Amino acid sequence: MNEPFIFRVSDCYYIQASYPSPAEHRHFAAHLVFAMERPFTALVNGVSVEAAGIAIGSDVPHTVLSEAPTLVVFIDELTPMSRCVKHTLLRGAPWRTLDTSVSSEVGERWRDVRTEADAAAAAAETERLLGLQEQRTSAEDPRILEA
């Protein structure tokens, strides 16, 4: 098994760890979860689903059950990436499973990440694979930035 890690890249935390049965919880953050070795079971909003990847919106009750390590992308609700996930991946749903082949590719991409530079490259590739790169470059309101 790979060593656990946590990397902050831009406004996301990328966490690889193995938590076999965490308690169901909810918080003010969205998640993307990817299998690193084999599919996991997610319990989301009372529904059990087996997946290689899942997007979970903010304030949605959830837990992921897996003996194998997973990659969890923790995304604060107030960030541009959270808006991208809502618009591109969730599309109005509280959660949505992600394409298996894309999810497997993301898990594979992160398998050998060990440094900040590796993490930055893997995060950019993850955004590209999920179609989040273009959406993320939305213009900020300059009036807010000046305040």
Set out the residue ranges of the language-model regions.
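N-terminal regulatory/effector-sensing and dimerization cores
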Residues: 2-92
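Acidic-enriched, low-complexity/disordered segments with a strong bias for Aspartate over Glutamate
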Residues: 11, 37, 59, 76, ...
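Intrinsically disordered, low-complexity regions
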Residues: 33, 40-41, 64, 92-95, ...
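General nucleic-acid-binding
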Residues: 72-120
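A short, Lys/Arg-enriched amphipathic alpha-helix from helix-turn-helix/homeodomain DNA-binding modules
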Residues: 102-106, 111, 115-147
